Amino acid sequence: MCLDGDRPVGYARVVRFGNIEELTELMVDPEHQGRGVGRALLGRVWPGDPSPDLGRVVVATGAPADLSLYTNFGVMPAAGHWHLRQRTDDYLERRSKEIDAAEPAVHVLEADRAVAEWQRLEPEALGHERPAVHEFFGRERTCLACMDESTGRAAGLCWVSTDGEIGPAVGQEPKDVVPVVLAALDRVAMTQEPPQLGVFASTIAWWLLRRLRGLGFRVHWPGWVMSSEPIPGLDRYLPTRPPNLL
């Protein structure tokens, strides 16, 4: 935290998951921006350079100057990170007209099974494990899953909360994330009835983006996933909402 006298004017927070440190928050008071506060905070939470034993990742949604600042701390763009929105009534109307879309059945998983399936699928997509995150979601959110009939295991998973927060989601393959995300959107649209639906998606998740674009979703705010090393499976992954974590 950075203080001006007794007044907080900025703070940063890093969370470690195995061999990755994720910057989850970097905030500077508008009156103190442009004075090097952000750089100083980053220097405290991310000292030195990343290494093969301890990498770095951040979901960056700031201005161009902010993105340039992150590159000085060893992270580079891995993929775009789009906040997508659509009016709920328009979404439901478009979904009702989808007569060709034959989709796999989606089921609700019990919390213990959901956490186990997440611990199997997510590390292959992100390149690191986050068991504590999914143990928390197992208590706070519902896990939707489509199953691979040949193995009896989950092919796609998506967490959704009772207040309409969708994500993260992951699939064995890029196409497998689509049915669970749509099922989560359907669930929120019909039970919560918010004025708008929102999700985050990486710009290389083409299977998902194609379906969302066909349902009228538009880019509300662009950002970047920035990392010190390649992330192997962002094409089959839907980031967390709210976007403090990847």
Residue ranges and their predicted role:
Residues 112-149, 182, 186-190, 203-246:
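N-terminal charged segments
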Residues 1, 6-15, 22-27, 152-167:
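Conserved beta-strand in the GNAT
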Residues 66-71, 75, 210-212:
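Conserved active-site tyrosine of GNAT-family acetyltransferases
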Residues 53, 72-165:
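Amide-forming acyltransferase catalytic core, primarily the GNAT-like/NAT-type
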Residues 140-146, 152-201:
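Flexible loop/N-cap segments at domain edges
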Residues 23-24, 48-64, 191-203, 221-223:
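Conserved GNAT acetyl-CoA-binding A-motif
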Residues 25-28, 34-48, 67, 72, ...:
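Conserved acetyl-CoA-binding loop-helix of GNAT-fold acetyltransferases
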